[in-house]
């Protein structure tokens, strides 16, 4: 009888554990914590202005760049004067102007997002139109919050002189002094020889002396990603996440340079599900080089088909913006921008 009681107790405990860790069928937006609020019910890839008063974001992939005032909550369109705008990202410069990323025109999802992805300058002046910078890039760019320094990665699709499978990180400056914006002082600071590490620039830190980037590990059965950092002066590279076989994509960095946000699949250890860029949530990683200090910030992947992604930190470190998405959609696709206030 004691054995039976013990067995029943174990079974009940197991059932409770399974129930606790099962993903909920409900909507995560119906269960937001008090420090999270919805800014928009559409849009993706948000970026916070240097003065923390506005948030730029994309209405959709291959669409228009938008701007929301955090005080009035009024939303305006930055590129609606561009016919058939097909941009993928909008990012603030320290001057208050913008960098746009995207193709000249939409051809197809793969070609327009890879071969034709390029940088544009958009003045903050009302009615301004985007100006091509003549620079093809892969995915996103790192934009300094202190200067006009930028960084980006390239693959052979954007730089035909690169061998297939290789990639490189380039640091440069944006020159606005001559009237026509121009990219100068381009320097390759790191290169990868194969697809075991496909590079993407993310954020500057330590007064622009260092750069956070992601190493996408695309060889082998598991598609992982690691949070990396490079000292631009010495070339020293550090793997901050140290978790091979798992997905850890670097996102917005905190202003003190001690922590960065990460899109990670670490919760799959408890929740199950396929690992990789689909089942992700937002985590915070201490940049101490141990890879052990991870803190989960959002719980959207606790819900069936839910994920949170693309976090960006305000320059005062008091809040971040991020987007809600669906696990089955391509990376970067979002359905609303949210604001997350860090608890004091």
Name every feature range the model reports, one short phrase each.
Residues 1-4:
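Positively charged n-region of N-terminal signal peptides that target proteins for export
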Residues 14-15:
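C-terminal motif of bacterial Sec signal peptides marking the signal peptidase cleavage site
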Residues 19-344:
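Sequence signature of WD/YWTD-type beta-propeller architectures
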